[in-house]
Curated annotation (Swiss-Prot):
Residues at the catalytic site: 131
Protein name per its UniProtKB record: Peptide deformylase
Annotated residues for binding of Fe cation: 88, 130, 134
GO function terms (MF aspect): metal ion binding; peptide deformylase activity
Entry-linked SUPFAM superfamilies: Peptide deformylase
Cofactor requirements of the protein: Fe(2+)
Assigned EC number: 3.5.1.88
Functional note: Removes the formyl group from the N-terminal Met of newly synthesized proteins. Requires at least a dipeptide for an efficient rate of reaction. N-terminal L-methionine is a prerequisite for activity but the enzyme has broad specificity at other positions.
Catalysed transformations (reactions): N-terminal N-formyl-L-methionyl-[peptide] + H2O = N-terminal L-methionyl-[peptide] + formate
Biological process annotations from GO: co-translational protein modification; translation
Keywords assigned: Hydrolase, Iron, Metal-binding, Protein biosynthesis
Biological classification of the source: Bacteria, Bacillati, Bacillota, Bacillota incertae sedis, Caldicellulosiruptorales
Amino acid sequence: MALRKIRTYEDEILRKKSKVVEKFDQRLCQLLDDMKDTMYEANGIGLAAPQVGVLKRAVVIDIGEGAIELVNPEIEQVEGSAVDVEGCLSVPNVWGEVERPQKVVVKAQDRFGNEFRLEAEGLLARAVCHEIDHLDGILFVDKVIRFVSEEEIEQRRSRGDKMDLE
């Protein structure tokens, strides 16, 4: 396993649409493992393949309940909405309030190509939507309602608020 370089907002790859994964092989497994290692090393809660320079529809997420791998994810259902603060490993030291669905149902495949559905709500739903946006060349700053200062982030952290600060 290896750490991969996280691309930042200046990199054009982050604005491109990712391709569907068609080969479920050792290279995909290696990519997913490397993405998890990279995400954990960077103290993130999610990482999409384009963020490590790979235009494939694959994401990893861990909001503290164990890693989830989503290959070729598609949002099938959304319910409700909520505004909360997000950040992104590809847009360092920038945070903002973003409106996202409160609940989502996602159809995806695992690393072996097996299809499954994931029902997510709250922070997990937010992280899933944020990462799927990356697969379509969308950054959270494109959806920010209000940018948030570092001081406000520190206040929220000191209260123990869970935020998608990737």
